[in-house]
Amino acid sequence: MFKVEKTLAATAMLATWLSVGVQAALAQDHHSHHGGEPAQLTLNNGKKWATDENLRQGMAAIRDGLVAELPAIHGDKASAGQYHALAKKINDQVAFMAQNCRLDKEADTMLHLVLTQLIAGADAMSGQKSNKAKYQGAEKIVHALEEYAVYFDHPGWQGVKVK
């Protein structure tokens, strides 16, 4: 019963993030705690932030899903359905990571900045906008994965190779 409630709570939280706009929500939260300075990814005293297995699993699944679609995306042959399916995979993994997060508070705060970029990219890919906007959404996902590699310790991480 507790697991079902936890799943429902995580799903509701993700839906709220998506409907309100994660970037605005995070920016507002950061603004209220730090005098209006924008939230920014930083290292943990010069070191990458620790990760847990759930985070590594979710980020690897996002990377793998994107890599599988890159030939079609770069060839301008990705259909709206392909973009939408990729966006769903990304949102599913973001929900999984949010539901199963075991990071300390500071690492979690940094992770939310990466998740914000992932959600923004997924939103652009699943929207009713042009293929150019969908392509730009995929670029946001690539950028988020690059930042993840810079700021988080994920042993064996292989980034996305963009042509």
Q: How should each PLM-predicted stretch be described?
A:
Residues 26-78, 157-160:
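Immediate post-signal-peptide N-terminus of mature secreted/exported proteins
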Residues 2-11:
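Bacterial N-terminal signal peptides that target proteins for export
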Residues 60, 64, 84, 88-95, ...:
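Solvent-exposed, polar/charged alpha-helical surfaces in well-ordered, non-transmembrane soluble domains
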Residues 100, 111-163:
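Helix-rich interaction surfaces within compact, conserved domain-sized segments
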Residues 11-21:
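Bacterial N-terminal signal peptides
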